[in-house]
From Swiss-Prot:
<feature type="binding site">
    <location>
        <position position="282"/>
    </location>
    <ligand>
        <name>D-dopa</name>
    </ligand>
</feature>
<dbReference type="GO" id="GO:0006551">
    <property type="term" value="P:L-leucine metabolic process"/>
</dbReference>
<feature type="binding site">
    <location>
        <position position="282"/>
    </location>
    <ligand>
        <name>D-proline</name>
    </ligand>
</feature>
<feature type="binding site">
    <location>
        <position position="8"/>
    </location>
    <ligand>
        <name>FAD</name>
    </ligand>
</feature>
<feature type="binding site">
    <location>
        <position position="315"/>
    </location>
    <ligand>
        <name>FAD</name>
    </ligand>
</feature>
<dbReference type="GO" id="GO:0005615">
    <property type="term" value="C:extracellular space"/>
</dbReference>
<feature type="binding site">
    <location>
        <position position="312"/>
    </location>
    <ligand>
        <name>FAD</name>
    </ligand>
</feature>
<feature type="binding site">
    <location>
        <position position="49"/>
    </location>
    <ligand>
        <name>FAD</name>
    </ligand>
</feature>
<keyword id="KW-0963">Cytoplasm</keyword>
<dbReference type="Pfam" id="PF01266">
    <property type="entry name" value="DAO"/>
</dbReference>
<keyword id="KW-0274">FAD</keyword>
<dbReference type="GO" id="GO:0042802">
    <property type="term" value="F:identical protein binding"/>
</dbReference>
<dbReference type="GO" id="GO:0042995">
    <property type="term" value="C:cell projection"/>
</dbReference>
<feature type="binding site">
    <location>
        <position position="282"/>
    </location>
    <ligand>
        <name>D-serine</name>
    </ligand>
</feature>
<feature type="binding site">
    <location>
        <position position="181"/>
    </location>
    <ligand>
        <name>FAD</name>
    </ligand>
</feature>
<dbReference type="GO" id="GO:0005829">
    <property type="term" value="C:cytosol"/>
</dbReference>
<protein>
    <recommendedName>
        <fullName>D-amino-acid oxidase</fullName>
        <ecNumber>1.4.3.3</ecNumber>
    </recommendedName>
</protein>
Length: 346
């Protein structure tokens, strides 16, 4: 069976690996991954990689399940020999608010969730309420490299080319297309509900920062208040969230806003050396689009599995979505009478 995966961010690569691991042993798959951007030039490479969903309940309850499945999968990998190459580690830190808020739906997923004590809040004089918990860090650049290695070992081919239309892929004789094009999905099929959520980050050298610090201001919206997330080599400072802004240029205004607010939150950052600055686009949509569609162009047709629209939480939800996409792929095989599938061990 010929499979074309379009998109090489965390969603595309993880979905490709999940499908190939589950079905290739019983039904040989000739899989190619098409993209005009590979690591380190994808949106996933810009992500700091903290596992944390949005604070509000998802409009699609299934997304909460996909978040949980991703956490469980990553936690099972935490002590494996692959963890370091994956960019996977435990990380603890703070969520800060100016007013009391309800506990998040994911509080029982993360480890050691609790409310901050008065003495802890004294460290953050601009905030009066907060949580502390331990979560997972999955650094995008390391993880994409690891996924690429796993897929290459399995014989999956990578094609550095922009796909202009579904029609060109279908007419090329592909049986199944996996559409993981993220914020650019609208170029292949119109989707009025998909928008870019532009983000900009500063990476600094600050090895003394050990905990993440996320602040929340409902009046500014998600990702528009300062956050600090330490990684294995650098610390990520953010953030901005600009809906509908397609500018890939780093903004001096946004840089100054991020730097000033993060240094106010953690004054020791004033001594940190700036290592880099990146801009990326979150694929914002009211809900993740994860569904099947059959496309026909003349006498040629193919099944398409859409998997995009993960907003700013692609790394948080990716493996649950990959497993669901693999389930849809299995149904396609069943309908084609090709399913001699072994039980999943994922």
């Amino acid at each position: 069976m010929r499979v074309a995966v379009i998109g090489a961010g965390v969603i595309g690569l993880s979905t490709a690996l999940c499908i190939h691991e589950r079905y290739h042993p019983a039904q040989p798959l000739h899989m190619k991954i098409y993209a005009d951007r590979f690591t380190p030039f994808t949106t996933s490479d810009v992500a700091a990689g903290l596992w944390q969903p949005y604070l509000s309940d998802p409009s699609n309850p299934q997304e909460a399940e996909w978040n949980q499945q991703t956490f469980d999968h990553l936690q099972s990998c935490l002590h494996s020999p692959n963890a370091e190459k994956m960019g996977l580690a435990l990380i603890s830190g703070y969520n800060l608010f100016r007013d009391e808020v309800p506990d998040p739906f994911w509080k029982s997923t993360v480890l050691g969730f609790r409310k901050l004590t008065p003495s802890e809040l004294d460290m953050f004089p601009d905030y009066s309420y907060g949580w502390f918990n331990t979560s997972l860090l999955l650094e995008g650049k390391s993880y994409l490299s690891w996924l690429t290695e796993r897929l290459t070992e399995r014989g999956v081919k990578f094609i550095h080319r922009k796909v202009a239309s579904f029609e060109e892929v279908v007419r090329g004789g592909v049986d199944v297309i996996i559409n993981c094009t993220g914020v650019w999905a609208g170029a292949l099929q119109a989707d009025a509900s998909l928008q870019p959520g532009r983000g900009q980050i500063i990476q600094v050298e600050a090895p003394w920062i050990k905990h993440f610090i996320l602040t929340h201001d409902p009046s500014l919206g998600i990702y528009n208040s300062p956050y600090i997330i330490p990684g294995s080599k650098t610390v990520t400072l953010g953030g901005v969230f600009q809906l509908g802004n397609w500018s890939e240029l780093n903004s001096v205004h946004d840089h100054n806003t991020i730097w000033k607010s993060c240094c106010q939150l953690e004054p020791t950052l004033k001594n940190a050396r700036i290592m880099g600055e990146l801009t990326g686009f979150r694929p914002v949509r009211p809900q993740v689009r994860l569904e099947r569609e059959r496309l026909r162009f003349g006498s040629s047709s193919a099944e398409v599995i859409h998997n995009y629209g993960h907003g700013g939480y692609g790394l948080t939800i990716h493996w649950g979505c990959a497993m669901e996409a693999a389930n849809l792929f299995g149904k396609i095989l069943e309908e084609k009478n090709l399913s001699r599938m072994p039980p999943s061990h994922l």
